[in-house]
Amino acid sequence: MDFAPELITIGQKAKDAARKLAYAGTAAKNKALLAMAEALLNHEQKILEANRKDVEAAIQKGTKKSLVNRLALTSEGIRQMSDALKEVVNLGDPVGEGEFWTRPNGLRIQRTRVPLGVVAMIYEARPNVTVDAAALCLKSGNAVILRGGSEAIESNKILSKVIAGAAESQGMPTACIQLLENTNRQWVQQLMKMNGYVDVIIPRGGAGLIETVVKEATVPVIETGTGVCHAYVDGEADLAKGVSIVFNAKTQKPGVCNALEAVLVNEAVAQEFLPLLGEKFRDYGVEIRGCEKTCAILPYAAKAKEEDWGIEHLDLIISAKVVQGVDEAMDHIYQYGTKHSETIITENYTTAQRFLNEVDAAAVYVNASTRFTDGGRFGFGAEIGISTQKLHARGPMGLQALTTMKYMVYGEDHIVT
């Protein structure tokens, strides 16, 4: 493939920056992160002004309200981004971590963590990802090429300019943080094939974006999957807990990947549980799309279509199904789940352990909301995404997931015989 000359320049600059950044000390990186945090606050009005342009354009295009809400920034949102950078400062630096051992022949081997190199982030219209990704990549010693959704281009331009300038002012390599300002899709297609310049691509967004990157990229991809997350309310559940957990997992922030999309209810408790949950959902404006049994119990529920079971609603919509027991629930999750986050509400230890061990997902819960699948809530600090694949990284990806292993071997005239 022929690459745009400008894209090659960006790739080469990132490669050169990654080489230098790999050896940057923790103190120097932390100093840069603090400068980035301060710069966001100092440029708040410019950032809000740019974001306003993006929001107005999105509204004029008829963009869904939930997506506009993701796009919009506020003064509080900028302060939160600044605080997130300071939190990354307080996280341990994974670069250089490792272990050391000596073989019987005297050969000394050190396994140590090193940066991946150049990370390309392809993501949708969420300006906070621009800052989070840049911070995590810098702390872990990686250069980053950012390609956000075109709807957030003005926001991303000012954010990347502000934080990159602050990092460089503290001695970080020039071009360690770069934004693809050209929103032409051909550039994205080329970026995904820039082996030799880019070491890994991390897509973050909806199913369409992730599927496109996984299908078309020749550069290695860490797949941050979509979240068709389920809650199974067991026949031995505490129903009050069930209502609380399911309601929180659906409504606390419905437009994110760890929000609940379907509830499966054991038939033994469906007649009692569904009206309790249904009334709370109805009062909050949540649309319920149910199976025949659900609709018989809740006359105001809409009849679910086949496509409702395997979709990320990302809105105040939930699918509901009555099941015979944990086996049918796990079969349903196996068929429609995306291996992201699944939860069971039960007081039965044996059933809980079966669910934990047999459900294949990055995070599996007992009596807790799926909304906890998050780097910060897991104690990793900020996250660059939630991986649903099994190779290299799985679940919330913090700093350590942006490193790999290197072996340093010390000998004294050791030869193989």
UniProtKB/Swiss-Prot annotation:
**Metabolic or biological pathway:** Amino-acid biosynthesis; L-proline biosynthesis; L-glutamate 5-semialdehyde from L-glutamate: step 2/2
The coding gene here is proA
Q: What is this protein called?
A: Gamma-glutamyl phosphate reductase
Recorded hits in Gene3D superfamilies, A to Z, give: Aldehyde Dehydrogenase, Chain A, domain 1, Aldehyde Dehydrogenase, Chain A, domain 2
Q: What is the lineage of its organism?
A: Bacteria, Bacillati, Bacillota, Clostridia, Eubacteriales
**So what does this thing catalyse?**
L-glutamate 5-semialdehyde + phosphate + NADP(+) = L-glutamyl 5-phosphate + NADPH + H(+)
What is the similarity comment for this entry?
Answer: Belongs to the gamma-glutamyl phosphate reductase family.
Report one GO cellular component: cytoplasm
Entry's Gene Ontology molecular function annotations: glutamate-5-semialdehyde dehydrogenase activity; NADP binding
Q: Does the keyword Ligase apply?
A: no
- Sorted UniProt keywords: Amino-acid biosynthesis, Cytoplasm, NADP, Oxidoreductase, Proline biosynthesis
Report the protein's function. Catalyzes the NADPH-dependent reduction of L-glutamate 5-phosphate into L-glutamate 5-semialdehyde and phosphate. The product spontaneously undergoes cyclization to form 1-pyrroline-5-carboxylate.
EC class of this enzyme? oxidoreductase
Species of the source: Desulfitobacterium hafniense (strain DSM 10664 / DCB-2)
